Amino acid sequence: YLAESGRPGPVVIDIPKDMTMPNQKFPYIYPERIKMRSYNPVKKGHSGQIRKAVTLMMQAKKPVIYAGGGVILGRASDELTKMAHLLNFPVTNTLMGLGCFPGTDEQFIGMLGMHGTYESNMAMHNADLIIAIGARLDDRVTNKVSKFCPDAKLIHIDIDPTTISKHIAAD
């Protein structure tokens, strides 16, 4: 349940050592009701932020869509592809985002970051707008934050609101 709710991912189950001892007997009393804790982030966009994002997209001359593993986890690959085609913006992926946008699509410019392609890294560096979707903007992509996409505005879209502006402030 926890691994699949909110922001899906691995879960640690920590069992105390004494519970695994073969000679110990621990009576377990089942509760009448169980309340499962989970992480349920707000999934509805803020209308003011959406309007601001649309304005930035309309003004952009050199935009790039930067898609990460969150697109795959969120099962949003089809929506990403439709959006990229509608806007006619180039798309780059992180390593964890590979496969969320067709690699054979003419708008795909390759993987970015320290192990990415020259073309995708230069497109990002020279962009005036970055639309980061399901991406953490971690150091594998940004390297030195102060020099990352120096002339670009940033739209950051993520299912986890605590990820937005965590490493780089979104506009």
Label every PLM stretch briefly.
Residues 1-2, 28-30, 76-88, 145-150:
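Short, solvent-exposed amphipathic alpha-helical segments in soluble enzyme
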Residues 2-59:
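Conformationally flexible catalytic loops at phosphate/diphosphate-handling active centers
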Residues 12-16, 66, 132-134, 158:
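Short beta-strand segments
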Residues 14, 88-95, 155-158:
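Short internal beta-strands
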Residues 15-21, 69-71, 137, 161:
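Glycine-rich beta-alpha junction loops
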Residues 23-26, 76, 104, 167:
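Short, well-ordered secondary-structure micro-motifs
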Residues 45-46, 52-130:
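Anionic-ligand anchoring segments at beta-strand to alpha-helix junctions in alpha/beta enzyme folds, i.e.
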Residues 97-171:
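Glycine-rich, acidic loop regions that bind phosphate or pyrophosphate groups
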